From Swiss-Prot:
This is Small ribosomal subunit protein uS7. HAMAP family: Ribosomal_uS7_B. Part of the 30S ribosomal subunit. Contacts proteins S9 and S11. It comes from Pectobacterium atrosepticum (strain SCRI 1043 / ATCC BAA-672) (Erwinia carotovora subsp. atroseptica). GO terms for cellular component: small ribosomal subunit.
Length: 156
């Protein structure tokens, strides 16, 4: 590990349609094999569908869905004296967003709807209503952290 200066995080360019860095990150997470224009088309179609269903703005509806999936605590494995403990730790804000987006995309890919845009729209609308696979994933992570609260003093 070099002892020189700490390198800052790269700036991500905001997406062309809404000017949101969060949405640009979401497009990048959804993208497969470098096909960004395809990923953008899927996201924009899904947001259009979501906005029509919810009656809110595109970004506002997306934000609500993302908020309901963001985890606040997670567990990390820590080895102490020959046994491994699942230690609950708070999730940093950047990682919260990354995990939430990853879980939404993962859940959308597993759905059985016709197109990816429709699957994504359905998953986002479920997330906005606090239901769906991505929200369940967050609840499972929180439940795991709650169950292992006794090991919180092993934090590092």
């Amino acid at each position: 590990m070099p002892r020189r200066r700490v390198i800052g995080q790269r700036k991500i360019l905001p997406d062309p349609k809404f000017g949101s860095e969060l949405l640009a990150k979401f497009v990048n997470i959804l993208m497969v094999d470098g096909k960004k224009s395809t990923a953008e088309a899927i996201v924009y179609t899904a947001l259009e569908t979501l906005a029509q269903r919810s009656g809110k703005g595109h970004l506002e509806a997306f934000e609500v869905a993302l908020d309901n999936v963001r985890p606040t605590v997670e567990v990390k494995s820590r080895r102490v004296g020959g046994s491994t403990y699942q230690v609950p730790v708070e999730v940093r804000p950047v990682r919260r967003n990354a995990l939430a987006m990853r879980w939404i995309v993962e859940a959308a890919r597993k759905r059985g709807d016709k197109s990816m845009a429709l699957r994504l729209a359905n998953e986002l609308s479920d997330a906005a209503e606090n239901k769906g696979t991505a929200v369940k994933k967050r609840e499972d992570v929180h439940r795991m952290a709650e169950a292992n609260k006794a090991f919180a003093h092993y934090r590092w």
